[in-house]
Amino acid sequence: MKSDFKFSNLLGTVYRQGNITFSDDGKQLLSPVGNRVSVFDLINNKSFTFEYEHRKNIAAIDLNKQGTLLISIDEDGRAILVNFKARNVLHHFNFKEKCSAVKFSPDGRLFALASGRFLQIWKTPDVNKDRQFAPFVRHRVHAGHFQDITSLTWSQDSRFILTTSKDLSAKIWSVDSEEKNLAATTFNGHRDYVMGAFFSHDQEKIYTVSKDGAVFVWEFTKRPSDDDDNESEDDDKQEEVDISKYSWRITKKHFFYANQAKVKCVTFHPATRLLAVGFTSGEFRLYDLPDFTLIQQLSMGQNPVNTVSVNQTGEWLAFGSSKLGQLLVYEWQSESYILKQQGHFDSTNSLAYSPDGSRVVTASEDGKIKVWDITSGFCLATFEEHTSSVTAVQFAKRGQVMFSSSLDGTVRAWDLIRYRNFRTFTGTERIQFNCLAVDPSGEVVCAGSLDNFDIHVWSVQTGQLLDALSGHEGPVSCLSFSQENSVLASASWDKTIRIWSIFGRSQQVEPIEVYSDVLALSMRPDGKEVAVSTLKGQISIFNIEDAKQVGNIDCRKDIISGRFNQDRFTAKNSERSKFFTTIHYSFDGMAIVAGGNNNSICLYDVPNEVLLKRFIVSRNMALNGTLEFLNSKKMTEAGSLDLIDDAGENSDLEDRIDNSLPGSQRGGDLSTRKMRPEVRVTSVQFSPTANAFAAASTEGLLIYSTNDTILFDPFDLDVDVTPHSTVEALREKQFLNALVMAFRLNEEYLINKVYEAIPIKEIPLVASNIPAIYLPRILKFIGDFAIESQHIEFNLIWIKALLSASGGYINEHKYLFSTAMRSIQRFIVRVAKEVVNTTTDNKYTYRFLVSTDGSMEDGAADDDEVLLKDDADEDNEENEENDVVMESDDEEGWIGFNGKDNKLPLSNENDSSDEEENEKELP
């Protein structure tokens, strides 16, 4: 069993807070998801999440124009600089103050950030002559605003910066001190916070947008004075312009009139003159400036639009809403959605892998069920029929049907081909179901209740209630069917485990006593053992046949449990969450993964009863329970100061409003407290492919995998990738480097030279170390090159080595390799056909050679029989259908891969049989 699992992706959350941004090519969208950053590839339909984590939720992110450096800053002002291509953290830095915005300059030399009421300009880390990576170097600090800065914008020539602030003003700043006279301007006149300020495409105008819906157009014009009439025409023709006589003045004023809705976010695309505005009502509008013509007006819902971004060409607009976790990419010219995703509003309760491991289903407290694609990371479908919290989900064996249980008293069956609810199961009375199990045949579904402690059994075909299994004296916590003999195992809070024979005649069940309440249960895939997690923090393993305990794992010391804000004692002395609430067997039965209401996921080796690896769920200090020690400065006799609700001190009215119902605090907590989400893991499950497992947590759906799917080009940032250096690497027998550099340069003659120069004995080693990003191009090259090449064996060795080393990755990413694999298939078909034709054309020559040898007369008779049989089969070859159709190929004698080949052997009958088997195995 592999134990080298690493974090690979985060599903279930697409946007949390902060700004979103496009890459320079417009193909990728970067979105902050809590304390991580997710990247959505809008062209290739896939996504990934960076492995690094912040200590708090991310407040601002930006990507430089070259697409190589990503900077992200959290709520406390701690920044992380990341190599975007390699996904490696390069530098940590603390700005020691909250940052509301960060932007790279268009030329990439500098980046500016809004730190409180100060504008800081820093030099972008770069590679100097000595090739040493330099840390952050501050270039300039500008002070002038009286309140916090809300946004900043660079000019296209990277000389000036526009900032907006809560002091109802905007300012223009120069990067260099020589031009400070040109930029010493303050834009006043707005009556509310200025949300954005932008340069026009020719930089002759400046647009400022305020929160109350006012748009001012500023132009750099000459000041009116009494001396203007006395100026001569010669003075007007002077080349030198006296800048002191010019100033920025308001030439036009426009208003949105959004029915009391405030402007929440705004962006402007200078090339297309497109202004995109998001409002607190969930509405967003598109305007054409400077005419202020309304182009489109749409809505995302009733929640505020928190951020908006536009790509480089101005065709796509991205909107984010943090209330429901919505992310939207809209193409305004065609009025169509490029991406429309939404995460779970509430915490996730359960997850289930599809039998092929390509999809995963999550169930949430909000009553919704979402189907996620593992490869792309996108949500495929959402089911909203449940009216209460969904407690469990599970697939049928074939993966086309899914079942779910809910606290609304129903168990529903879902068709994942038509995406509809085709069956609803209910009990004789209204009860709540909290666990679910499906028979391997898919004919019976069982659910355990919280109210009457019974296990209800339904027929999937008829939808009728078949039986109610009683015997438990407490709520049924977990159910599981055996995959071999359809035995049902149930666990309960009454400290017992019961093994039920659903299809047997006898329903007498002897309970297996456990020393504590059973919280979770998992049955080994072979159905011989069952593992349970108890309230005492132990995982006990029982043999099903003789009901004896065969193993016990003490997990209390392996669990990482932090201190909560409302705790009066330390985490070390706390009994909170010192147990696992969900466990799952690996498919070989050698390992168990476990999680609970704590900050750890543990992987155990079952035979040796030891901990293999422990994973930290989240390092986000904004979650309750991630810290082992609390800040003593905030601890008082009444509790932690973090519990005090300071929402009434917010500047925005919508943030100060108390949304609690009148009288809802009666009999409860009479003081206003601020509650933070708790870190927890509600469900874990291994993937059927055995190379990954998923965990449903507070942060979302965490995917841990053993596959290194990072597509990093190691030569992308190297300036020495030249044809000369490629030939030099080949001469020094650095075959892998030479091959990758040749594909990096994309010179056909160079690729051919390097490819043919690699020795046959080195091919397996080179093929096993090729970066995954180059696999489609190399396979496509071999498929096209081999058709015209005479090196048949050489090309086949390359194909075998590549498929052996990367077959799993190719199978998981079929959409990337479809073209390349068709080219290779065409080459293999032609080779096989040529071999068969050569054998057929030479069979009479072989017969003549055999007949001249007197010592082989007996064998010749046998050969004649083979030839006669072969000739008889030739008449039937025309009626056989081939799986692969070759273009412009009319030669006879080829019978396809599915045909039976009875051709004459070249040496003896044994070799012939071997060749027949090999030809049948050809794909």
From Swiss-Prot:
List of residues that carry Phosphoserine: 225, 232, 651, 664, 912-913
Any one of the GO CC terms: nucleolus
Q: Which PROSITE patterns match?
A: WD_REPEATS_1 (PS00678), WD_REPEATS_2 (PS50082), WD_REPEATS_REGION (PS50294)
Q: Which regions are annotated as WD repeats?
A: 12-52, 53-93, 94-132, 144-183, 189-228, 258-297, 300-340, 343-382, 385-424, 428-470, 471-510, 513-552, 575-614, 676-714
List, alphabetically, the Pfam families matched.
Answer: ANAPC4_WD40 (PF12894), Utp12 (PF04003), WD40 (PF00400)
Ordered alphabetically, the record's keywords are: Nucleus, Phosphoprotein, Repeat, Ribonucleoprotein, Ribosome biogenesis, rRNA processing, WD repeat
Q: Which domain of life is it from?
A: Eukaryota
Q: Which GO terms describe its biological process?
A: endonucleolytic cleavage in 5'-ETS of tricistronic rRNA transcript (SSU-rRNA, 5.8S rRNA, LSU-rRNA); endonucleolytic cleavage in ITS1 to separate SSU-rRNA from 5.8S rRNA and LSU-rRNA from tricistronic rRNA transcript (SSU-rRNA, 5.8S rRNA, LSU-rRNA); endonucleolytic cleavage to generate mature 5'-end of SSU-rRNA from (SSU-rRNA, 5.8S rRNA, LSU-rRNA); establishment of cell polarity; maturation of SSU-rRNA; maturation of SSU-rRNA from tricistronic rRNA transcript (SSU-rRNA, 5.8S rRNA, LSU-rRNA); ribosomal small subunit assembly; septum digestion after cytokinesis
Provide any one GO MF term from the record.
mRNA binding
| Acidic residues composition bias: residue spans | 869-893, 911-923
Q: Where is this region: Disordered?
A: 653-674, 869-923
- Cell compartments where the protein resides: Nucleus, Nucleolus
Known role: Required for bud-site selection and cell separation. Also involved in nucleolar processing of pre-18S ribosomal RNA.
Miscellaneous comment in the UniProt entry for this protein: Present with 16700 molecules/cell in log phase SD medium.
Which family, according to the similarity comment? Belongs to the WD repeat PWP2 family.
Q: How does it assemble?
A: Interacts with snoRNA U3. Interacts with MPP10. Component of the ribosomal small subunit (SSU) processome composed of at least 40 protein subunits and snoRNA U3.
Name recorded for this polypeptide: Periodic tryptophan protein 2
Give the originating organism.
Answer: Saccharomyces cerevisiae (strain ATCC 204508 / S288c) (Baker's yeast)
Question: Taxonomy-wise, where does this protein's organism fall, top ranks first?
Answer: Eukaryota, Fungi, Dikarya, Ascomycota, Saccharomycotina
The gene designation is PWP2
